[in-house]
C-alpha cells in the first residue's frame, strides 16, 4: 500500500518528544510491513512567526509564502534526520524532484513547493503523483467536524463525508493568505477530486493507529472524493 502522511505544523509546535517517538516507531512498522510512505510537513508556528514579522514590515505575499515554505522544509529535515535509516536524506523542493526521489524506495519527506500553494496542496499533488491509496492528514483534532470545534462546543465529529460537504464546512473558515491555511484549501480539494484520492483526517496523537487504517479499521474522518 502507498500512503502520504501530511503532518500539521502544530505537531512540531508542541515540541512533544513522545509524539516524535510514536511517529518514528509507527513509520518503522509501516515500512517493515512492506508499505511505501511519503511525508509532507507543515510550517507551524515557525512559519507563522516569520510571516507575521514580514507582513508587518510590508513584505509581499509571495515572499511571505517563501518564508513559510522554508519553515516547512526545516520541519521536514527534522523528520528526515530522525528517520535517517529509512528516509531519503534530501528534502525535495518541487514535484519533479519528489518523483525522482520516490524511485529510491526510501521514505521521502518534503515541505512546501512553491508560493501560493499550501502544504495540503503539496500532499494532494504527491498523492496524485504516486497514486496513493490514502492521503492521511494528521492534525490536532480527531477528524472533520460539522463546525469549527475551537469555537463551537456542540461541534459534531463526522466519521464519513464527501468533498462537497467538506467545501461547505470550510467556506467560512479558510483564508488564502500565507500562513493561514487549515486542513484542505480549494486547490487541494480539486486535486483530490480529479484523482479520486481517499483522505483520512486523524489526530497526530494517534499516529500509532495508522497500521489499523491500513488493515481496514475506520479511524478519524474519511473524506470521499466527489
Swiss-Prot record:
Subcellular location, principal: cytoplasm
Binding site for ATP: 6-10, 44, 48, 139-140, 145, 148
Binding sites annotated in the UniProt record for UMP: 43, 65, 113-119
Keyword annotations from UniProtKB, A to Z: ATP-binding, Cytoplasm, Kinase, Nucleotide-binding, Pyrimidine biosynthesis, Transferase
Organism in which the protein naturally occurs: Sulfurisphaera tokodaii (strain DSM 16993 / JCM 10545 / NBRC 100140 / 7)
Any GO molecular function: ATP binding
UniProt name for this protein: Uridylate kinase
Subunit structure: Homohexamer.
Family: Belongs to the UMP kinase family.
InterPro entries for the chain: AceGlu_kinase-like_sf, Asp/Glu/Uridylate_kinase, Uridylate_kinase, Uridylate_kinase_arch/spir
Function: Catalyzes the reversible phosphorylation of UMP to UDP.
A Pfam family the protein falls into: AA_kinase
Regulation of its function: Inhibited by UTP.
GO process terms (BP): 'de novo' CTP biosynthetic process; UDP biosynthetic process
Compartments (UniProt record): Cytoplasm
SUPFAM superfamilies in UniProt: Carbamate kinase-like
Family matches, as NCBIfam families: pyrH_arch
Catalyzed reactions: UMP + ATP = UDP + ADP
Pathway(s) per entry: Pyrimidine metabolism; CTP biosynthesis via de novo pathway; UDP from UMP (UMPK route): step 1/1
Amino acid at each position: 500500500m502507498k500512503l502520504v502522511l501530511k503532518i500539521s505544523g502544530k505537531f512540531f509546535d508542541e515540541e512533544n518528544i513522545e509524539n516524535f517517538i510514536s511517529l518514528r516507531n509507527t513509520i518503522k512498522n509501516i515500512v517493515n510491513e512492506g508499505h511505501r510512505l511519503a511525508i509532507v510537513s507543515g510550517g507551524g508556528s515557525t512559519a507563522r512567526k516569520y510571516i507575521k514579522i514580514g507582513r508587518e514590515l510590508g513584505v509581499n505575499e509571495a515572499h511571505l509564502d517563501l518564508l513559510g515554505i522554508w519553515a516547512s522544509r526545516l520541519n521536514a529535515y527534522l523528520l528526515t534526520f530522525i528517520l535517517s535509516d529509512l528516509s531519503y536524506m534530501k528534502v525535495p523542493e518541487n514535484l519533479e524532484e519528489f518523483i525522482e526521489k520516490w524511485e529510491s524506495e526510501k521514505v521521502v519527506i518534503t515541505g512546501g513547493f512553491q508560493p501560493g500553494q499550501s502544504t495540503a496542496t503539496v500532499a494532494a499533488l504527491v498523492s496524485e503523483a504516486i497514486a496513493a491509496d490514502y492521503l492521511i492528514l494528521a492534525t490536532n483534532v480527531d477528524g472533520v467536524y460539522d463546525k469549527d470545534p475551537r469555537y463551537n462546543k456542540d461541534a459534531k465529529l463526522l466519521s464519513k463525508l464527501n468533498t462537497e460537504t467538506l467545501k461547505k464546512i470550510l467556506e467560512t473558515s479558510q483564508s488564502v493568505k500565507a500562513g493561514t491555511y487549515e486542513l484542505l484549501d480549494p486547490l487541494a480539494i480539486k486535486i483530490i477530486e480529479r484523482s479520486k484520492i481517499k483522505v483520512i483526517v486523524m489526530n497526530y496523537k494517534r499516529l500509532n493507529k495508522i497500521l489499523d487504517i491500513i488493515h481496514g479499521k475506520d479511524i478519524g474522518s474519511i473524506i470521499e472524493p466527489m
